[in-house]
Amino acid sequence: MERRQFNTSNIRNGTGRPRKTPRSKLYMVYPPLSGEDSTNPEPEEGSSQENNPTEPSSSQSNSVQNQDQSEDQSQLPQQESNTQQESNTQQESNTPSPRASNTSTETPAPLSPIQPGIRNIPSGLLLPQEKVGRLMGYPFYRDFNFTLNPERYQKLIYVFQILKNAARNHRNGASLLRKYFSLARRSKRTTDMFVTTIEEMRKRSLENSRKRELEEAQEREESNKRQHTESSAEPNAESSTESTTESNAESGAEPNAEPSAESTTESNVESGAEPNAESGAESGAEPTAESNAELKQRIWEILSYRLEQSNNETNNTGESNSTSQQPRQLPNNELIMNIRVLQKNTHAKPVLGRIKFTPDKSNKTSLTGSQNKVHSTNTQQSQKHPQQILTNSETHKPQQYSAQSQQQMVHQTNSHEPSQKRSPPPQQQQQKQPSVPTSSVPLQVSQKQNQQQQELPLPPQPQPQQRTAPSAVKQQQSMQMQPPPQQQQQQQRHQPLQQSPPTMPLQQQPVPPVQQVQTVPPPSSQPQTQLSQQQQQQQQAQLQMQVPRCYQYQNRPPSQQRQYSQTPQYNQPPPQQKVYALPPQQVYAPPPRQVYAQPTIACKQQYPQQLYEQAPQEGSSYQHHYQQVQQRQNQQPYMQSAPTYQQPHVQTPKSTRSNKQEKQRLPKGQEQVPKATRTMFEAFTGSNIAVEKLRQRTLDNGREPERLRTEYVNVLSSPERAAEKSTSRSKQSSNQKPVVKQQSSFPPPIKHQQTQEQQGNILPPVSQLLAIQSSTVTSRGSNASGAVMGSGNTQRVASRSFTNTFVAEAVVNNANNRGGPVPPTGPETNTRGGRASTRSSGRPRGNRSTQRAEGNVTGRVARSTDGSQSQNSGKASKISNIRNLLN
């Protein structure tokens, strides 16, 4: 027991997932089980468990059994939850448990009957997961997974069950198992055995499924081609395509997991009358022929490995027929499968939740004939809330409505605004709902018919918030799906197939249907309007005529819209408050709250700008707030931030040390020192702040901080001392004479030149360092270490400033990225040695990068191998300079 307590900390880390513990730790707690029969995990080995020293004492297990009866979750000790879970799987192996349905399939029945109390579990089959749980005393370790995500494997109890499930229902069954067993590995042999069996299974099933897939794919493609051509050719073919697509959808994505025998036969019967009956029969017939048991077997195999390799596979057509048999236990896998079937040859990774479920078999019309072509758009609609639709379709068979009552109902639901209060503005809704294929709202029909048709709501759309009462969904389904009694409407419903491209999203539709607004809870929950139905129809028609697109969410004519939306009086109720008593025109005036919030977002209207440009009405607290804000802004527009970000090279809190000293003590001509560096870095970064940081870094790294910096300053301030110091400190090559011009006396020649001129021998600014470095690195490489032949200062600095590679790369990259000539900057003076020289001619032997890089910063000093420095400007001198370097 002590040992067990001792290990707790290792396994548990705060997140509730175990941290991967070194295997030795696991062994400490659980030595290999003594009686284990590694080759055959199935038979019970209850006896061996008794020998296991780490098992809980018998008294403990007894207390556990008692608690098992009263499932006391709060105190659930390790064993209890374990056993309880096992018993669950036993009962539920046929009917999926809620948790199981999320992740894993039907779990095969446990290998041995389970009595409460962990002792009775065959020890060979004990999982690391359970051990860990017991080890930690972690009460619901059943939910908690060893190295896997909890969502993926929740209910796997026995090793063997895990083996079966993982191998079958998981894309990476094998690898997952390997993970499990590498942790739990009691003996290498068992693991190997498991893995090998899995791999054999995989091979076998892969071969089988490949053959089968090819056959099925061919059949299906043929039938689909036939259907497509026929449906495009003849108007009658619609209902048949409808039925066949439906059989696809049903067999593939069927929400109420009945084996597809029903659905396929049904679709066959339907399509039988139509000209292309054979095609329907073809797609349906094959699976029904075989016995269910066979099918199930086959499907499991296919599914697992199909899924496992779904990402690599190229022919993604296939077994939607066979999948339908699969019991409704792993929605995830099912979804993935069916998606792969629906999006025929796309190789994208499967996206979950993409499928359009047919909510109920009776509602045949919900899938219009265009379904096959529309797959991509339609499937997107699929379930954001599959649960809702499912429950409805299963529990209630929707009632029949006459066309009359349908219209009535729709009117009521639409005309009441209050339901919309808390809903997001419809524009946003539309972006959330992937485009609805037009085929569901027939458009190009004569005007009067239009009115009738469009007053049917769209097929139930997944709402961003689940406000729709189930009954509303039900009604809509029934309205949309039961073909209304008049034959004429039936005709209409299918016309748009020929007329309008099926995939055109709602945003582009010529006549925007009012129903986009939102599906609203059914009328029973709201006060009835006193309007007669005729009036309502008139209004609907009017709206369709007048209302520009962005007002639609409001459902009322623009005159009123304008009335409120431009003056944001937030806390005042709108002028009319008797919303429903008004004559029909005003029925749509919304309840006070929602008026303002929506229009601004949904349609861009004037008043957001007005808030800034001219003060709108006074009196509302909202307005008051805005005025205050404006005043605040006007008083101190940029004072706060300006110095930091506008010219960071002059003052930044970070760079105080170096910059302040330079600034304070430099003589008059010197203020521009930072400027040169800034231009230098702007070539690389383009932003002053970044420049400043970099510059600071180089200053701090590059110099031996205090001594060098003070020296720099002192030297600059007195030329004579400068001469002495520089001679004493640096071993100079013979031809360098430390002649330093006297700064204070005469005006600086050109800004960028002066920086280098005045510094003369002593530490060059960053730009210079960079130049030096680039030249050394990019020239032939003997120098590349960063040792520049020159005065001692610069040598040290160059090697240190920042890593050679960084500078060199920056410079070179820059150079290579933009070629082209560099504008000459003026006469070249070689201030260093005191001899002013102009050089020209010659082609560089080296790469163009150095030459280019030197061009980037206007005045930069390149240093040649003899240590002399030359001020570069024109291209010619640059070239000669490089030649100098290379010689």
From Swiss-Prot:
One Gene Ontology term, aspect cellular component: nucleus
Stated induction or repression of this protein's expression: Regulated by EFG1, NRG1, and TUP1. Expression is increased with increasing cell density and during host infection. Expression is repressed by linalool.
Positions of region (Disordered): 1-117, 203-293, 311-330, 350-542, 555-578, 614-675, 696-758, 813-887
Keyword annotations: Coiled coil, Nucleus, Transcription, Transcription regulation, Virulence
Ranges annotated as biased composition (Basic and acidic residues): 203-231, 696-710
Annotated Polar residues bias: 1-13, 76-107, 261-270, 364-393, 641-658, 729-745, 865-887
Keyword rRNA processing carried by entry: no
GO biological process, one term: filamentous growth
Subcellular location: Nucleus
Composition bias, Low complexity: 57-75, 232-254, 311-326, 399-408, 428-456, 475-519, 526-542, 622-640, 829-844
Description of the deletion phenotype: Leads to yeast-locked cells.
Coiled-coil region: 199-234
Protein purpose: Transcriptional regulator involved in extension of germ tubes into elongated hyphae and maintenance of filamentous growth. Regulates expression of UME6. Acts in a pathway that regulates maintenance of hyphal growth by repressing hyphal-to-yeast transition and allows dissemination within host epithelial tissues. Dispensable for invasion into both host oral epithelial cells and enterocytes, but required for epithelial damage.
Protein name, UniProt field: Transcriptional regulator DEF1
Gene field: DEF1
